[in-house]
Amino acid sequence: ITDLSFVKINQVSNANPQQKNYKWGTVELTKWTSYKGLELEGLLYKPEDFDPNKKYPLMVYFYETYSQDLHNHYVPKPTASIVYATEYVSNDYIVFIPDIKYVDGHPANSAFDCIVSGTDHIAKNSWIDTNRMALQGQSWGGYQTAMLVTMTDKYCCAMAGAPVSNMTSAYGGIRWGSGLSRMFQ
C-alpha cells in the first residue's frame, strides 16, 4: 500500500515467498547474421549479479521461435525437459534461446545455420566459457539436438528431450492426446 506520491510503500502480503530463492536475472534481445546471411534474433538471459569479468557456462535452448516472448514471465517450476531460464541464471549460467528460420525441405540445415551461428555470436563474448557450452531441445527440438551433435563438436553436452530419432517409425507412431497416427495429421 502506498500514498499518492509512491514514496512510502508498505508491503501487506508475501504471496510468493519462494521467489527469494531465485536470482531473477535479466533478458535482452540479441541479433546476429547467420552463416547464410539471415538476420536473426534470440533471447539472452544473464544472472542478476552478472559480472563481465567472470566466465559463465552457456545453455543453448531452442524450439522454433522465442524472441516474441521477450517480455513474458515464466514461473519457475519442475518440467520434463523445457529449460526455464530463471533456474539456470540462478545457478550462474547464461541462457541463449535463438530463433530458427526454416527453409522448406531443409530443417537440419536451417537449424544448424540459426542455432550454431547464434552460438558463435554469443561465444565471442569474453564472459562465455566456450569449454562449457550445452545444447537442449524438446520434441522437435530434441530431434534437432540429436541431429546437431552429429554436425558439430561445439557443445560439451546435449540433452534431447522426447526426440524422434527415426522418422520412418515415427510416421506411424500414435500421437499423445489425439490417439491418431502421425500420418493423419
Regions found by a protein language model. Name each.
Residues 1, 70-72, 104:
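A flexible loop/linker signature enriched in serine peptidases of the S9 family
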Residues 1-54, 78, 83, 90:
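Non-catalytic accessory segments flanking enzyme active sites
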Residues 14, 18, 50, 68, ...:
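Conserved helix-loop functional segments at active or binding sites
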Residues 48-49, 65-66, 164:
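Flexible, active-site-proximal loop/turn residues at the rims of small-molecule/cofactor binding pockets
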Residues 54-56, 131-132:
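Short coil/turn segments at beta-strand junctions that form active-site/ligand-binding loops
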Residues 56, 63-68:
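Active-site glycine-rich loops that stabilize anionic/oxyanionic intermediates
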Residues 61, 75-185:
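Active-site-proximal cap/loop segments of hydrolase catalytic domains
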Residues 68-70, 168:
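Glycine/Thr-rich phosphate-binding loops of Rossmann-like dinucleotide-binding domains
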